[in-house]
């Protein structure tokens, strides 16, 4: 077994033990247990509003990453969970494939249309979000930099050491953000842009909401984030948020555990979220989301809600679900695991371009090449390899060798620049 797989196995065992401990108390008939990928801050207002309803029961939440919840819900602990609240269709697909979700009939069309076709029998969409760039204006001013407003602007060499991201393997929010970029720009151009941006990263955060918190703390200057984490922080005058011009939508899904002993109360909670009152709660700035139903006429957020909902840049979620493991591992191999080397290579390139006062496209091409072609990326025969551990490991090794060789060639070419 490789060292990477040993570390991954050990981490999963530790996480599973911690999660089991968090559910050690037996589920109670007078409470709902919600497993969610959202932060406590993102769900606090929703839960508070629900508990003011007549006959409402107390809610207990388990806030974890999608990967951690996937491991948790594959154990007998699932029997203590009533609802799953997440923006991750990947998590819901995993639960559905393992027969972990109850059916949800008779949902309104405004909810159903935002749910991927294969999940429509088991999940409701109650709200949605968009993607943009969160900026610490103080950090920008200190460096005399413009506020970035698009993916392309994040490739500017002046942002070296100021950008933050998470990775698709650590955050399904970032997985969907990355997939949105790859599908809109095309496989090759999308990866070239991501690799270019990686040269400006300060670090890769382990949690998506951790990225927004780090920007607020001034540990970074700008980051692509989902809007609900940004809106929760925008009371700070030092922060600004702008939607990406080609932002896709990211629905908030709710599903009921097949093993829930409180299904009637769980359904009542979903009915509340889809009611007029519940939609108003979800539209409140303290949740940072947009409701699936229209906002009142004159509400300043309605034009943005409508633009995001009707964006032509929506994702092929079936493709996202099919090639999930491949994209996650490719991002980590290309960027996460070699971030230091990537930063050094791009810094050397920027220095060389500044010295000769012209771009060096042949070296940029070396630093942005990928070991997986656009054709392979959409080929089931290729991405299905990652369902087989042995075949997947062979690909990871090939990718590592590819990036090492590209780096070697780039350095050799930089040494020739005069």
Which residues does each predicted region cover?
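Bacterial N-terminal signal peptides
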Residues: 12-22
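Early extracytoplasmic/lumenal segment of secretory-pathway proteins
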Residues: 28-93
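Extracytoplasmic ligand-binding site segments that recognize negatively charged/polar headgroups
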Residues: 44, 80, 87-205, 210-219
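Beta->alpha turn/N-cap motifs
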Residues: 64-66, 85-90, 108, 207-208, ...
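A ligand-binding cleft/hinge motif common to bilobed small-molecule-binding domains
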Residues: 90-94, 216, 220-238
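A bilobed periplasmic-binding-protein/Venus flytrap-type ligand-binding module shared by bacterial periplasmic
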Residues: 134-139, 249-263, 281-282
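Mature extracytoplasmic/periplasmic domains
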Residues: 257, 262-265, 270-318
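C-terminal non-catalytic accessory extensions
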Residues: 342-418
């Amino acid at each position: 077994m490789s060292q990477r797989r040993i570390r991954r196995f050990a981490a999963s065992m530790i996480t599973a033990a911690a999660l089991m401990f968090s559910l050690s108390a037996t589920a109670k008939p007078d409470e709902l247990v919600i497993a969610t990928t959202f932060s406590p801050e993102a769900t606090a207002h929703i839960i508070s509003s629900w508990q003011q309803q007549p006959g409402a029961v107390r809610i207990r939440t388990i806030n974890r990453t999608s990967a951690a919840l996937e491991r948790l819900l594959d154990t007998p602990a699932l029997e203590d969970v009533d609802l799953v609240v997440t923006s991750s269709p990947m998590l819901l697909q995993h639960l559905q494939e393992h027969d972990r979700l109850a059916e949800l009939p008779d949902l309104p069309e405004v909810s159903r249309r935002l749910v991927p076709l294969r999940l429509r029998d088991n999940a409701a969409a109650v709200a949605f979000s968009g993607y943009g760039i969160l900026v610490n204006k103080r950090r920008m001013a200190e460096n005399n930099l413009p506020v970035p407003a698009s993916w392309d602007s994040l490739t500017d060499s002046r942002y070296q050491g100021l950008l933050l991201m998470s990775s698709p393997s650590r955050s399904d929010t970032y997985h969907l953000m990355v997939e949105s970029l790859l599908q809109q720009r095309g496989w090759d151009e999308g990866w070239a842009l991501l690799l270019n941006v990686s040269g400006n990263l300060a670090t890769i955060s382990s949690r998506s909401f951790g990225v927004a918190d780090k920007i607020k703390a001034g540990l970074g200057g700008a980051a692509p984030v989902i809007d609900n984490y940004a809106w929760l922080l925008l009371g700070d005058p030092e922060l600004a948020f702008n939607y990406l011009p080609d932002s896709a939508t990211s629905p908030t899904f709710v599903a009921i555990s097949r093993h829930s002993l409180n299904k009637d109360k769980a359904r009542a909670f979903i009915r509340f979220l889809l009611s007029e009152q519940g939609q108003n709660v979800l539209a409140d700035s303290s949740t940072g989301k947009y409701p699936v139903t229209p906002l009142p006429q004159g509400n300043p957020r309605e034009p943005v809600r409508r633009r995001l909902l009707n964006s032509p840049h929506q994702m092929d979620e079936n493709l996202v679900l099919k090639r999930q493991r491949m994209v996650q591992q490719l991002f980590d191999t290309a960027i996460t695991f070699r971030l230091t080397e990537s930063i050094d290579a791009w810094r050397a390139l920027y220095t060389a371009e500044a010295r000769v006062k012209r771009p060096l496209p042949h070296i940029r091409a070396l630093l942005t090449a990928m070991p997986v072609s656009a054709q392979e990326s959409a080929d089931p025969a290729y991405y299905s390899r990652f369902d087989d551990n042995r075949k997947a490991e062979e690909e990871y090794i090939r990718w590592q060798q590819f990036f090492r060789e590209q780096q070697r060639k780039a350095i050799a070419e930089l040494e020739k620049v005069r």
